[in-house]
Amino acid sequence: VLSPADKTNVKAAWEKIGGHGAAYGAEALERMFLSFPTTKTYFPHFDLSHGSAQIQGHGKKVADALANAAAHVDDLPSALSALSDLHAHKLRVDPVNFKLLSHCLLVTLAAHHPAEFTPAVHASLDKFLASVSTVLTSKYR
């Protein structure tokens, strides 16, 4: 459960990310594909080379979804309902992949904002991403 301090940290972090969200999303995807090659199986139609338009486009989708979640942190199930349906019923993404992408996103944010990535902010973002992952996998049952 996200505390009021966590929610404040998440919203502040997302404001700091600002216009870099798409680039950070793409970078996190690239990190995931390099670090966890089995995740590539969900993207057989993508050009997975560094900086490809498809990775950039999907990175923007990831960033936009997370920005929406941060803006609606008090009602994640409603904010992410359509994405949960998509990933559970159409794409059938293994739920472990959300954790892998979350880890890669945390690494990306820490690399770009080391001064702001305090232990408290790290913990808040980790809890937020875990909450997002939980909602995205809620319709798998």
Swiss-Prot record:
Statement: the UniProt record of this protein carries the keyword Metal-binding: yes
Domain Globin: from-to ranges: 1-141
Residues annotated for heme b binding in this entry: H87
Phosphotyrosine: residues carrying this PTM: Y24
CDD domains cross-referenced by the UniProt entry: Hb-alpha-like (cd08927)
Claim: Acetylation is one of the keywords in the record: yes
An annotated GO cellular component: blood microparticle
Record-listed O2 binding positions: H58
List of residues that carry N6-succinyllysine: K7, K11, K16, K40
Organ and tissue specificity: Red blood cells.
Subunit structure: Heterotetramer of two alpha chains and two beta chains.
Protein name (database record): Hemoglobin subunit alpha
Species, as recorded: Marmota marmota marmota
Encoding gene, per UniProt annotation: HBA
